[in-house]
Every structure is written in structure tokens, then in C-alpha cells.
Amino acid sequence: ESRADASIEKFDDNNSGFFALVHAFREASKLRDLANLYTVLDRDHRYYIGSKTGRITAYADEDPTDSRSKIIKQAEFQFPEEVTGPVMGLSMTYDGWLIAATEHGYVVAMSRDLLEYHTIRLQHSEGAEAKATKPTGYGWIRNGFAIDEEGGIYIASQQHMHKVVWTGDGLSTSTTDGAWTAEYLNGWGHGTGATPSLMGFGNEDAFVVITDGEPQMNMVLFWRDEIPADWEQLP
């Protein structure tokens, strides 16, 4: 905390010019292991961060009763060897499992103590390791994701919208569990730049919404659950 305060004070004193840029670069370099900006803080004040190498780290207060106590590394989990790609998003299910998605199309569910885990790979992700369209931030998965209260996990890949289902004891991409995959327009080739958003709750029509990959983007709504029998698809 004292180092953070000192850095902020230095920016307050001088926030322009060459030396300010050097200071900003040095401070930003402390975050070089982060894979993305999507992190999670749980109800017990554990802070979870994902790395470029598939490592999840949990930080917490040294004294759980004192929020001003020293922050310590509480737990760490390295993805198994077969799960590849930088961590592109972190979130949590309504029953308290931490969910991560990697750039190469893997989804990992972890207990909050990082001792148990389940993995699955998204459909259409074959060869995702070689499908990045630019050096940074344009991989097969490049955004965060959304989770609904029924365990639906909504992930946008380079050309598809995916619903993965957390069943309570595992991850599923099977339609029998309510999972699905749908293609969207991708004229510019890089895929959507949007994090999926949930729309409709309670008795309302339930959708997941993204912008597509067209040069002039369209807003696209996907039915989250079973499509009504009387719905007429747009041409």
C-alpha cells in the first residue's frame, strides 16, 4: 500500500512529459504477467487473477478480520498441461465455482480454494492455437464471458457464440444439458470485440447479446434457452 501511495503521489506531482511516461511504463510493467483485465473478488475477499501461462492466483488479507492487514498469496493453481492458452476471462457461478476460459477454447471450473477442478474444450476450437489474427488481443477467444443463475456460461469465440453448462459437478457442451453453439457473421475476420451480455430475466424472453464481426457491426441476440415454437427467424 505504501508503494502504491508513493507511485500515485509521483503521478500527482508530474503527470506529463518524458519522465512521467518512464514512470508509467515502470508501473505498468508490474502487471506484465496478467493475461487480461477480467479478475474476480469473492465474498470472502479473495482476489483471483489469471496469468498468460494458465496460472490462477488467489490473494487475501493476512488477517481476515482486518481489511488493512497485509495482502498475501493464499493459493495458486496451474492448469493441467493439456489446457493451453492465456486466461482470457474469470467469473463465478451462482453456486460459487470459479470459471476461467482460455484463448485456445478451454473452459476450467475451479473450487474457490483451488483444490478441485473440471475442464472442457469448446466446440469448433480445433486449431485455435493458430487462429489469432493479430499478435495481441485477437485470439480465438478474446473477451470475457457471462454466467446466468442456471449455470449457463456464454462465451464468444472467433465465429461462434457458445453456451456451456455448469451442471453442479462438471462442465457440459451437450445439447441434452442445454448447451448450444451458433455461428454469427464475421466479415472482418477478427470476431466480436464484445463481452456477451445477458438480457431478459424472470418471465421475460431471455437472450445473450453481442455485436458481430462485420465491418459495420450488428447487435445480435441469441435465445439463451429453448427457442419458442412460434418464433420466426429473421432472414
Regions found by a protein language model. Give the residues of each.
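A short beta-strand motif characteristic of beta-propeller blades
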Residues: G17-S29, R68-E82, E116-T136, G178-N186, ...
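Glycine- and small hydrophobic-enriched segments that form the cores of compact globular domains
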Residues: L98, T102, R112-E116, H124, ...
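Structural motif
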Residues: R3-D5, T53-P64, H104-R112, Q158-T167, ...
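Repeated scaffold domains used in trafficking and secretory/extracellular systems
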Residues: S7-E9, V22-V40, Q78-D95, A130-I147, ...
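Elongated scaffolding segments in large macromolecular assemblies
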Residues: Y38-Y47, G54, E62, T93-L98, ...
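Post-signal peptide N-terminal segment of secreted/secretory-pathway proteins
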Residues: E1-E76
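Long, internal scaffold/assembly segments composed of regular secondary structure
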Residues: G144-P235
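Short beta-strand elements that form the blades of beta-propeller/WD-repeat-like
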Residues: E1, H45-S51, D95-T102, V108, ...
